[in-house]
């Protein structure tokens, strides 16, 4: 619970939906890898905090129902498709107030483009940049990672200002020095679990 749900709650805080959200018109949320550990938590938290529509993206057909069970208003399955972003755009024609992305180079630029004015892109991982092997990395794996790093999309500061968009990134290592923040997060998470608003299984 602490690492997975803590990651999700901090992402929601960076998106300004917790502990209290501003009364903005657009409260649409897009969650990548929405059937995974952090993603499923983000979907549940977004619904609990009054976001909507909450749109989840999954990578396989068998994950669609799991994402819906977490409360997603719409689920986009990208397996074997090149046009899945069209479905993402159609689910929230005015763009998204927040997009949560742990994919890395594969989706970052398009995620940024899908933000509404004042929208926030929250980045907490780069799993498409990493090799999917458990053994020693080969020279090919290192080359692939280098190519991914070189392909990272640039984000122009002037564009951030003109569009009123923002980008936030984090990893949990900073939690070690923020015990008060961790205590606040744990109190909220346990309250949601006790109220049946957050499923951790």
Annotate each PLM feature.
Residues 1-201:
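Terminal helix/beta-alpha structural elements that buttress the NAD(P)+-binding lobe
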């Amino acid at each position: 619970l602490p690492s997975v749900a803590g990651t999700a709650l901090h992402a929601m805080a960076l998106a300004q939906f917790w502990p209290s959200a501003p009364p903005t018109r657009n409260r649409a949320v897009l969650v990548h890898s929405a059937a995974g550990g952090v993603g499923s938590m983000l979907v549940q938290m977004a619904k609990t905090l009054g976001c909507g529509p909450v749109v989840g993206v999954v990578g396989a057909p068998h994950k669609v129902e799991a994402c819906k069970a977490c409360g997603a208003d719409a689920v986009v399955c990208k397996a074997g498709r090149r046009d899945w972003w069209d479905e993402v755009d159609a689910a929230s024609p005015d763009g998204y107030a927040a997009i949560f992305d742990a994919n890395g180079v594969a989706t970052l630029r398009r995620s940024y483009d899908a933000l509404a004015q004042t929208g926030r892109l929250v980045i907490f991982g780069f799993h498409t940049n990493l090799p999917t092997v458990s053994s020693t990395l080969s020279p090919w794996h290192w080359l692939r990672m280098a190519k991914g790093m070189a392909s990272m999309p640039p984000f122009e500061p002037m564009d951030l200002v003109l569009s009123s968009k923002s980008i936030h990134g984090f990893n949990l290592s900073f939690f070690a020095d923020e015990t008060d923040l961790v205590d606040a997060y744990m109190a909220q998470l346990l309250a949601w679990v006790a109220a049946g608003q957050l499923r951790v299984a």
